């Protein structure tokens, strides 16, 4: 993928930059004008009320019916700063909708100057986007997080900047804290980057398919290919814990198990033995000067996947074993 400099050329002209500033300012005005005159929708009333409870010091308890906690904490902060009213209940949505307009400026490397400016224009005047930017629900907030995910991951693919991955990781985390629809977002990006990874590996390998595997397992090159997948998959992996509740119950532990005794006596011994074996193997590999390879990665992967997904064991050994497995899985020769 061509880098941003190759696609956009020189810095934007003052008129182009001014157009984004004007559209963003106009979008803000359209979203703030008469913001509190319309009666609150049922969903808006729930978000406004429970955020007000938090603002009043009555605490917050997560309820999946109203999705993630981000909106309630952000609205409570807005109440603290600007007071509580129907207008301030919608202020978060208005700000996110406005920020999405300005963010189109950074889409120029991929949409082109005309395309990015057109996107900003459409976001400014779109009746649907304008409506949800004046609606105290998570729709426009999620749309803004998704736009930041696109900007972060696409910029990383183009320029390999760690800051771009941090942006994407933050947006994914905030997306999960806002609404469960982020599962779908992660699935879309995961499929895309998985297919892109395969294409790049086979292009780099040429007529030798084994070269693709060597690239994927190379300590020097693997991070460049796998970092977006690690961000997308790693942040979302613990969110899929419900998918292992039934298998855990079949094994005799977890909240769905018929026996309330949890965990079973053998769970700690089994997990500790596996973690110890992985750490011992990785230390031995480091002493022998062996770089981490496919075999070691495959050995660590199941343990690293099961522990974030499994119903949480008691804290006194959960963190210890998880850290031993994940950080001990790479031999010392790979740390420096």
Predicted features and spans:
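Membrane-integral, polyisoprenol-dependent glycosyltransferases
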Residues: 1-296, 303-336
């Amino acid at each position: 993928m061509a880098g941003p400099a190759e696609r956009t050329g020189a810095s934007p002209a003052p008129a182009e930059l001014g157009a984004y500033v004007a559209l963003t300012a106009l979008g803000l005005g359209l979203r703030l004008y008469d913001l509190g005159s319309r009666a609150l929708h049922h969903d808006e009333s729930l978000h406004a009320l429970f955020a007000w409870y938090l603002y009043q010091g009555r605490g917050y308890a997560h309820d999946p019916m109203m999705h993630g906690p981000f909106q309630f904490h952000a609205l409570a902060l807005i109440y603290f700063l600007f007071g509580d009213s129907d207008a301030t209940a919608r202020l978060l949505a208005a700000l996110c909708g406005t920020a999405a307009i300005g963010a189109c400026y950074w889409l120029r490397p991929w949409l082109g100057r005309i395309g990015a400016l057109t996107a900003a224009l459409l976001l400014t005047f779109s009746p649907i986007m304008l409506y949800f930017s004046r609606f105290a629900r998570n729709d426009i907030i999620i749309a803004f997080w998704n736009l930041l995910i696109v900007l972060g991951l696409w910029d990383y693919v183009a320029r390999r900047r760690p800051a771009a991955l941090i942006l994407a990781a933050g947006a994914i985390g905030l997306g999960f804290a806002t609404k469960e629809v982020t599962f779908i977002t992660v699935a879309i990006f995961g499929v895309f980057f998985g297919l892109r990874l395969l294409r790049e590996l086979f292009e780099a390998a040429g007529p030798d398919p084994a070269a693709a595997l060597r690239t994927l397992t190379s300590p020097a090159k693997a991070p460049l290919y796998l970092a977006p997948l690690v961000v997308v998959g790693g942040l979302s992996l613990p969110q899929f814990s419900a998918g292992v509740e039934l298998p855990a119950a079949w094994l005799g532990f977890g909240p769905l198990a018929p026996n309330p005794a949890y965990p079973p006596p053998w769970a700690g011994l089994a997990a500790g033995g596996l973690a110890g074996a992985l750490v011992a193997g990785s230390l031995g590999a480091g002493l022998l000067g062996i770089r981490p390879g496919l075999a070691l990665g495959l050995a660590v992967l199941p343990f690293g996947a099961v522990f974030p997904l499994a119903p949480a064991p008691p804290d006194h050994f959960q963190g210890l074993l998880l850290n031993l497995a994940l950080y001990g899985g790479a031999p010392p020769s790979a740390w420096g």
